Amino acid sequence: MSGRGSFRFVLLLVLLASCSLPRPTVGLAINGTTVQGSREGSYCQTGGCSGVCADSLAPTAPLTALRAPAPVRLDFSTGAEVNQIHGDIWRGDAMNGQPLESFELRGTERSYTSQQMRGGRYYLLVSLGWSRVTDRGDTSVAFLIELTPP
């Protein structure tokens, strides 16, 4: 195979591999405690290889009980390709009525301090926006937290 043919073959392999990249995920920690997230909720992913969207009901998240002082700091962990994190916080087990609080993190911001969360149960729906060379999109994950003051 010639040098030019080898280059094209390698380029084709790189493009095919990049078409199968998974959507980014997000982790959440509060006061050093990892909060378990739900399965992936609604998402859209578009790029040079294909485009796909799926809508679902609001994800059900497992309950994580923890102690944390107010104000509560939410620390997110995710890949560098994520350039937007949007969160809505409801008091209780699910999305009922208007969110108690909403926030937007852009670029490399990965922490948010809630002024509303105190003792009690909270449902968080977190949406990620990302952009890579080969694709872009958004996805969502839910968290369910029971906070107890220290």
Language model segments and positions:
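Mature extracytoplasmic domains of secretory-pathway proteins
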Residues: C44-T46, G51-Q98
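Short acidic/polar inter-strand loop motif in beta-rich domains
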Residues: W130-D138
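Sec-dependent signal peptide recognition
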Residues: R4-L12
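C-terminal motif of bacterial Sec signal peptides marking the signal peptidase cleavage site
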Residues: L16-S18
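Transition segment at domain starts
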Residues: S20-A61
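Short beta-strand segments within Ig-like beta-sandwich modules, predominantly Fibronectin type-III
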Residues: E101-T108
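Surface-exposed, short loops/turns at beta-strand junctions within beta-sandwich domains
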Residues: S114-Y122
